[in-house]
């Protein structure tokens, strides 16, 4: 394959927003309880996001108009978003998105699928945790305004027949090109894992590795959480 195009500047979704504050007469204002999370969103036929699924398994309708990148219809997107839960007007509860962007979430590929080889430029893990069908990662990378390309390398998949256990070893593909290290930026990644949790696996562990700025390999191991 050609060099994967999952850049540091991931797509920002178009939002038509109401104000964050609502006047309740005089000087009284209501400030909604804003949450920030990784979410799985689905767009409808018109390219607008219809629903979001939280990592605790709760499905909500999206109450405001949010357009998927390129107005892509009938697709599933992994996003990181600021949102608030609100009554939907018919006795239920939905969410209003105040800011959202897609995450870097390609399916991991074996090393031989990268025609130009594996790029292992360093990055720092700010946070990493297991979500619903995804491993969520917030990276800090040193940048100077140029493009950084990310992907995930499937290094090894081991199967224990006796225990019906699958162990998956993944690593970060990071190509910083010639970008100078002037300042630090964040990158939001979320590795899809459902393809490894097939019916024959009673359990699944995921090992994720990357090179840090000290030139050392860091590894993190998680147990997959069944939906």
Give residue spans per PLM region.
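First exposed extracellular module after export/assembly in secreted or surface-exposed proteins
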Residues: 2, 33-227
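Bacterial N-terminal signal peptides that target proteins for export
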Residues: 2-11
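C-terminal motif of bacterial Sec signal peptides marking the signal peptidase cleavage site
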Residues: 18-23
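Bacterial signal peptide processing site
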Residues: 25-28
């Amino acid at each position: 394959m050609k060099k994967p195009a999952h850049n540091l500047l991931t797509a920002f979704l178009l939002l038509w927003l109401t104000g964050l504050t609502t006047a309740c007469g005089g000087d009284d204002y209501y400030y909604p309880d804003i949450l920030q999370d990784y979410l799985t969103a689905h767009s409808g036929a018109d390219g607008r996001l219809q629903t979001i699924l939280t990592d605790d398994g709760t499905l909500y309708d999206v109450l405001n108009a949010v357009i998927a990148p390129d107005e892509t219809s009938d697709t599933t997107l992994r996003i990181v978003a600021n949102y608030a839960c609100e009554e939907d007007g018919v006795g239920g509860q939905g969410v209003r998105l105040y800011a959202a962007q897609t995450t870097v979430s390609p399916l991991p590929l074996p090393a031989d699928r990268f025609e130009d080889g594996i790029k292992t430029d360093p990055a720092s893990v700010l946070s990493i945790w297991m979500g619903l069908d995804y491993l969520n990662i917030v990276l800090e990378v040193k940048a100077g305004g140029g493009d950084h390309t990310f992907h995930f390398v499937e290094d090894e998949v081991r199967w224990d027949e006796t225990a019906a256990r699958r162990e998956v070893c993944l690593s970060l593909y990071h190509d910083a090109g010639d970008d100078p290290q002037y300042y630090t930026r964040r990158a939001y990644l979320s590795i899809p894992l459902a393809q490894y949790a097939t019916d024959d696996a009673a359990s699944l562990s995921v090992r994720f590795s990357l090179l840090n700025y000290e030139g050392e390999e860091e590894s993190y191991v998680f147990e997959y959480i069944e939906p």
